[in-house]
Amino acid sequence: EMILHVCRNALGRTTVTAHDGSEIDFAGEWREVRYKDIVAERTECPDWFSLPKDEKVARAVALGIEIDPALEDFEITNQVFEKRIEPTLLRPTFVTHLPKELIPLAKLSPDDPSTIEVFELCINGQEIAPAYSEQNDPLAQREMFEAQAGEEIQKIDNDFLVALEHGMPPAGGMGIGIDRLVILLTGASNIRETILFPPVRPSDGR
């Protein structure tokens, strides 16, 4: 509603032009789709998430994506999402239930603990606003940190975990990419055109 409100008040209409020349109507339907579903749909591979790693790599390469063999399974999939799927999401789309490995600070989804309570709002082929529920269970958070750290256990933020043990109420947050939104609304050709206070040279030229 906020983006629709801004569009109406700034432009006097509810539509903007996408990068491919098509029209995006913020007053229209905003799609909601799970990460696993959109990956399976756009790769035309319903069993993508059960494929062995080498098969994922082969399919990603066939899509024109360079893949480092050292990447984890979830990283390979996310490369496919970011480089071949996200750019095609022109109309407003909430992508939900991302893999838990992508955001270790997010709360696990109660209906699928392999995913997290998160959404990414994609418009015009870009992520405009990521949001998620904060993990406030210290035991679950420690497990995520340990999985992320692997053998580098010293990287775990124990002070943060101790703070969680003292108690944290339910919380969540969202960050809107204002610069990307301004580009979308104004048709700016470069992100530098949206910076309110760009760096400038001193008057003496130094």
Enumerate the language-model features and the residues they cover.
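Class II aminoacyl-tRNA synthetase catalytic cores and aaRS-like
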Residues: 1-206
